[in-house]
Amino acid sequence: MIERYLARVGLDGGDHSLAELQRAHVQSISYENLDIHLGREIRLDVDSLVDKMIDRRRGGYCYEQNTLYAAALEALGFTVTRCLGRVRLSDAVSPRPATHMALLVDGLLVDVGFGAANPLGPVPLGGEATYGPYTWRTERTVSPEGEQVWMVRLFDMPLYTFTETPHHPIDYLTPNHFSSTHPLSLFTQMTIVQRWDDGDVQVGLVGLGLTERLPDGEVKTTSVDPGDLGDLLRGRFGLELDDDEVDRLARFNAQQQSAAPARS
């Protein structure tokens, strides 16, 4: 598996640092939830993830990304702690379900499952790390739920909180089921595809809205025509999808767009 994984992220079979591995992963394997909208179960066993994300060159969301990455790191000799956290993106104080999977290696956060805001390399607990023009940091705090947690920030923006309590693969089956099937889950309501592009550009496609955040802070937004969706997913995001899959996703997003209330 490890040879195929390294080839998938564009690395040779030599020794690589955690920083090299993490950047290669987040720039090679897109964050995405498309299988939810194609009516497929999100499986978290490593064999299924190797088939999907390596052999079929698809992406995945946090449980898929970090489960695959943890397996690769362990195959390379690293000791990995699997953690669980709460997303804080849009409101840092509201209680949130614990639905984000994160990873630790030797006191370093090595998460590859947070989409376009994902750190480009390891971040030390209680410290910060700068990659290109972006700085991530972790700090101890007490969450609204009363937990002693680590807060992860991109600059000053809160991303998520997590604890260092070790979790096992079976612990993610229930939050994965909620995230991929429950009508209140953000992932069942819209398609989300994100990645770090070349040049440290954050690229996100939510429904048919494309957002590009450039290193200098400029933000570009574009409305995507459903007929152009396939070229965008295959080209910009590197996802191998057949014509039927693209058509189904385009129809879903066109329906979502037409059902959305008009802006005045």
PLM regions: where:
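N-terminal accessory/pre-domain segments preceding catalytic cores
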Residues: M1-D15, A19, A75-L76, S143-S264
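Secondary-structure boundary elements
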Residues: M1-R57
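Generic structural "secondary-structure junction" signal
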Residues: S28-L38, V46, D51-R56, L125-G127, ...
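Short loop/turn segments at secondary-structure transitions that flank enzyme active sites
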Residues: H37, A116, G199
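Short secondary-structure transition/capping segments
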Residues: V46, V93-R96, A254
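Hydrophobic/aromatic-rich core segments of domains that either
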Residues: T67, A71-T138
